[in-house]
Amino acid sequence: IIQTRAINSCIQGTKPVIVATHMLESMIESPIPTRAEVTDIANAIREQADCVMLSGETTVGKYPIECVETIQRIAKRIEEEDKQVLRKDLILNLSRSKMLRSAAYLAYDLEGSLVVFTRRGIFAQKLSSLRPNVPIYAFTDKPVLFKQLLIMRGVEPFFMEFDHDHE
């Protein structure tokens, strides 16, 4: 319950949320996760965390590659089951936020994707918080922002130089 509240609070505040609590601890010594660990990962994905993170499992564990493959397989399966178009509980007060929600609905209806050009990441972050069931492609010319965009749910960042000519 506490994890769910924390995740929802972060999403409401358009803050990325990472769940990292010994996700596959048993895989430090064993090539197969416990049922409880699989359930914990599945729940974090269902609760719409931006990402789940491994730590000791990959740094000191005997099966680091299997850990990454396992968490990826679980995440992919749960995300495929998610048929929700957008988070409807997200409160949008600004007209530009409502515009982003409309764009997300349109992209979903057209089976398309969303493209954002960003120097600060605000629109990409807001779109990610809506949790649209379409890809978000974010282009930036800032290396630090590129790395920040990597952890946002549904966002695939691209680094590119922007033209500074305003014509």
Predicted regions: what is each one?
Residues 1-4, 33-39:
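Charged helix-capping and loop-helix junction motifs
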Residues 22, 44, 127:
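Conserved, mostly hydrophobic/aromatic
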